[in-house]
Design a protein with these regions (language model features):
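Surface loop/turn motifs at the tips and blade-to-blade linkers of beta-strand repeat domains
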Residues: 24, 107-112, 156-159
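Long hydrophobic segments that form regular secondary structure
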Residues: 97-134
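Local beta-strand/beta-hairpin segments that build beta-sheet-rich folds
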Residues: 2-5, 74, 153-157
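Loop/turn position at the start of each blade in beta-propeller repeats
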Residues: 28, 88, 111-116, 137, ...
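Beta-propeller blade signature
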Residues: 1, 91-99, 142-151
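Predominantly five- to eight-bladed beta-propeller fold
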Residues: 5-33, 41-99, 103-107
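Beta-strand C-termini and the immediately following turn/loop, strongest in propeller blades
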Residues: 1, 31-34, 43-49, 83-87, ...
Length: 168
Protein backbone atom coordinates (compact mmCIF):
# COMPACT_ATOMS: atom_id res chain seq x y z
CA UNK A 1 0.00 0.00 0.00
CA UNK A 2 1.00 3.62 -0.43
CA UNK A 3 1.34 6.23 2.29
CA UNK A 4 2.75 9.72 2.49
CA UNK A 5 6.23 9.97 4.02
CA UNK A 6 6.76 13.75 4.06
CA UNK A 7 4.43 16.70 4.50
CA UNK A 8 6.69 19.70 3.86
CA UNK A 9 7.16 19.37 0.10
CA UNK A 10 6.11 22.49 -1.78
CA UNK A 11 6.55 23.54 -5.40
CA UNK A 12 9.64 25.75 -5.83
CA UNK A 13 10.43 25.51 -2.11
CA UNK A 14 11.08 21.98 -0.80
CA UNK A 15 11.75 18.75 -2.70
CA UNK A 16 11.95 15.41 -0.89
CA UNK A 17 13.58 12.50 -2.70
CA UNK A 18 13.49 14.31 -6.05
CA UNK A 19 16.65 16.21 -7.03
CA UNK A 20 16.68 19.87 -7.98
CA UNK A 21 17.99 21.20 -11.29
CA UNK A 22 21.68 21.28 -10.23
CA UNK A 23 21.66 17.65 -9.13
CA UNK A 24 19.85 16.48 -12.27
CA UNK A 25 22.18 18.33 -14.63
CA UNK A 26 25.54 18.36 -12.86
CA UNK A 27 25.45 15.02 -11.03
CA UNK A 28 23.16 13.04 -13.40
CA UNK A 29 21.01 12.37 -10.34
CA UNK A 30 17.36 11.58 -10.91
CA UNK A 31 16.39 9.68 -7.77
CA UNK A 32 17.31 11.10 -4.38
CA UNK A 33 16.04 8.23 -2.23
CA UNK A 34 16.86 4.60 -1.53
CA UNK A 35 15.34 1.62 0.28
CA UNK A 36 17.22 -0.45 2.84
CA UNK A 37 18.10 -4.03 1.90
CA UNK A 38 15.38 -5.36 4.22
CA UNK A 39 12.83 -2.81 2.85
CA UNK A 40 12.13 -1.47 6.35
CA UNK A 41 13.58 2.00 5.84
CA UNK A 42 13.73 4.71 3.21
CA UNK A 43 16.48 7.31 3.09
CA UNK A 44 16.03 10.49 1.08
CA UNK A 45 17.68 13.81 0.38
CA UNK A 46 15.67 16.93 1.21
CA UNK A 47 16.32 19.95 -1.02
CA UNK A 48 15.34 23.35 0.37
CA UNK A 49 15.37 25.52 -2.74
CA UNK A 50 13.34 28.37 -1.23
CA UNK A 51 16.29 30.81 -1.47
CA UNK A 52 17.37 29.79 -5.00
CA UNK A 53 16.60 32.51 -7.58
CA UNK A 54 14.00 31.92 -10.28
CA UNK A 55 14.89 31.82 -13.97
CA UNK A 56 12.45 32.42 -16.81
CA UNK A 57 12.98 30.24 -19.85
CA UNK A 58 11.24 31.17 -23.15
CA UNK A 59 8.75 28.59 -24.39
CA UNK A 60 8.03 28.37 -28.13
CA UNK A 61 5.53 26.43 -30.23
CA UNK A 62 8.09 23.81 -31.21
CA UNK A 63 7.41 20.25 -32.17
CA UNK A 64 7.06 16.93 -30.34
CA UNK A 65 5.01 17.92 -28.50
CA UNK A 66 3.72 20.97 -30.30
CA UNK A 67 2.54 23.73 -27.98
CA UNK A 68 -0.08 25.51 -30.09
CA UNK A 69 -0.78 28.09 -27.36
CA UNK A 70 2.64 29.60 -28.20
CA UNK A 71 2.10 29.82 -31.97
CA UNK A 72 1.93 33.64 -32.10
CA UNK A 73 3.81 34.64 -28.95
CA UNK A 74 6.25 32.65 -26.84
CA UNK A 75 5.39 31.76 -23.29
CA UNK A 76 7.74 31.22 -20.40
CA UNK A 77 8.62 28.45 -18.01
CA UNK A 78 9.85 29.61 -14.62
CA UNK A 79 11.97 27.40 -12.44
CA UNK A 80 14.65 27.49 -9.74
CA UNK A 81 18.00 27.89 -11.45
CA UNK A 82 21.11 28.76 -9.44
CA UNK A 83 23.75 30.36 -11.64
CA UNK A 84 27.41 30.02 -10.65
CA UNK A 85 28.15 31.87 -7.44
CA UNK A 86 24.55 32.21 -6.21
CA UNK A 87 22.72 30.22 -3.54
CA UNK A 88 22.14 26.51 -4.15
CA UNK A 89 19.54 24.35 -2.45
CA UNK A 90 20.29 23.54 1.18
CA UNK A 91 20.42 19.76 1.47
CA UNK A 92 19.90 17.32 4.32
CA UNK A 93 19.56 13.54 4.49
CA UNK A 94 16.69 11.82 6.31
CA UNK A 95 15.66 8.27 7.11
CA UNK A 96 12.11 7.05 7.50
CA UNK A 97 11.20 3.87 9.38
CA UNK A 98 8.27 2.38 7.47
CA UNK A 99 6.83 0.44 10.43
CA UNK A 100 7.14 3.07 13.19
CA UNK A 101 6.71 5.99 10.73
CA UNK A 102 9.55 7.87 12.46
CA UNK A 103 11.68 10.27 10.41
CA UNK A 104 15.22 11.14 11.49
CA UNK A 105 17.54 13.82 10.13
CA UNK A 106 21.05 12.42 9.73
CA UNK A 107 23.72 14.21 11.77
CA UNK A 108 25.67 14.98 8.62
CA UNK A 109 28.28 17.75 8.88
CA UNK A 110 27.76 18.98 5.31
CA UNK A 111 28.64 22.60 4.52
CA UNK A 112 25.64 24.93 4.20
CA UNK A 113 26.43 25.22 0.48
CA UNK A 114 27.68 21.65 0.07
CA UNK A 115 26.36 18.84 -2.08
CA UNK A 116 25.05 15.33 -1.38
CA UNK A 117 25.40 13.82 -4.86
CA UNK A 118 24.54 10.24 -3.83
CA UNK A 119 23.02 8.17 -1.04
CA UNK A 120 22.86 4.38 -1.08
CA UNK A 121 21.98 1.76 1.48
CA UNK A 122 24.58 -0.98 1.78
CA UNK A 123 23.65 -4.67 2.02
CA UNK A 124 23.55 -4.05 5.77
CA UNK A 125 20.25 -2.22 6.46
CA UNK A 126 21.90 -0.43 9.38
CA UNK A 127 24.44 1.29 7.09
CA UNK A 128 23.60 4.12 4.73
CA UNK A 129 26.42 5.43 2.53
CA UNK A 130 26.24 9.21 2.03
CA UNK A 131 28.57 10.98 -0.38
CA UNK A 132 29.26 14.70 0.05
CA UNK A 133 31.21 17.37 -1.79
CA UNK A 134 31.99 20.90 -0.73
CA UNK A 135 30.87 23.69 -3.09
CA UNK A 136 34.35 24.03 -4.60
CA UNK A 137 34.28 20.27 -5.20
CA UNK A 138 37.81 19.74 -3.96
CA UNK A 139 36.79 17.71 -0.88
CA UNK A 140 34.83 14.46 -1.11
CA UNK A 141 33.62 12.62 1.98
CA UNK A 142 31.97 9.23 2.18
CA UNK A 143 29.99 8.84 5.39
CA UNK A 144 28.54 5.68 6.81
CA UNK A 145 25.36 6.56 8.65
CA UNK A 146 23.16 4.54 10.95
CA UNK A 147 19.62 5.36 9.76
CA UNK A 148 18.14 4.56 13.18
CA UNK A 149 20.50 6.60 15.37
CA UNK A 150 21.22 9.27 12.69
CA UNK A 151 24.94 9.14 13.57
CA UNK A 152 27.31 9.61 10.61
CA UNK A 153 31.00 8.71 10.56
CA UNK A 154 33.54 9.57 7.87
CA UNK A 155 34.74 6.41 6.10
CA UNK A 156 36.76 8.06 3.31
CA UNK A 157 37.97 11.60 2.64
CA UNK A 158 39.63 12.72 -0.58
CA UNK A 159 40.96 16.25 -1.04
CA UNK A 160 42.62 17.94 -3.97
CA UNK A 161 44.02 21.41 -4.55
CA UNK A 162 41.76 22.10 -7.54
CA UNK A 163 38.81 19.67 -7.65
CA UNK A 164 38.05 15.98 -7.25
CA UNK A 165 38.18 14.29 -10.65
CA UNK A 166 35.82 11.41 -11.26
CA UNK A 167 37.69 8.34 -12.45
CA UNK A 168 36.20 6.81 -15.61
Amino acid sequence: SESQVTKDGEYNKVLNGIPDWVYEEEFSYNRAFDFSADSKMIAYVRFDESQVPMYSFPWYKGMAPEKTEYTTYPGSYDYKYPKAGVVNSKVSVHSFDIKSRVTRKMELPVDSDGYVPRIKFTDDPEKLAIMTLNRHQNRFDLYMANPRSAICKVAIRDEAEQYIKEQA
